[in-house]
């Protein structure tokens, strides 16, 4: 079985969630499969193994799981990027576009030092609004965003292209057509 098919087969698709017409790509089944989880993390890490990565930033919530594992393998620190109001210390924030409206994310102001090399990690990239906001937030405090990594890309929705337009290389392990 090829790597792509192996990983794709561990992702559960839930139709009409969270609303009619949406095909939700659920990675909890991938996370529960020890072999698939290890292979996915190894593949996310591979391009940067042996290079200097200072921090891995994970987007709430599934990006925490993947980002923590990636940070561990790279011997890098981990930085949580959370929804507004969830972090206890002084924060820096960024508004970002959602399908209907806007939201705000934040991180601790001292989580990344200027010039540190950071990889952004999340489970999936769709329209790219959240990831774009995270890149801008990291850059706002002086981070060098080396790349953005995802298990799943939904290329029809254009998110990866949006990040590449910001000069951020994008690594996705698998892609699903549609939304």
Swiss-Prot record:
Its main location: cytoplasm. GO terms for cellular component: cytoplasm. It is found in: Cytoplasm. It is an enzyme of class 2 (transferase). Pfam families: Pribosyltran (PF00156). Keywords: Cytoplasm, Glycosyltransferase, Purine salvage, Transferase. It catalyses: AMP + diphosphate = 5-phospho-alpha-D-ribose 1-diphosphate + adenine. Gene3D superfamilies: 3.40.50.2020. One of its GO terms (molecular function) is AMP binding. Pathway: Purine metabolism; AMP biosynthesis via salvage pathway; AMP from adenine: step 1/1. Catalyzes a salvage reaction resulting in the formation of AMP, that is energically less costly than de novo synthesis. Belongs to the purine/pyrimidine phosphoribosyltransferase family. NCBIfam families: apt, PRK02304.1-3, PRK02304.1-5. Homodimer. This is Adenine phosphoribosyltransferase. It comes from Bradyrhizobium sp. (strain ORS 278). The lineage of its organism: Bacteria, Pseudomonadati, Pseudomonadota, Alphaproteobacteria, Hyphomicrobiales.
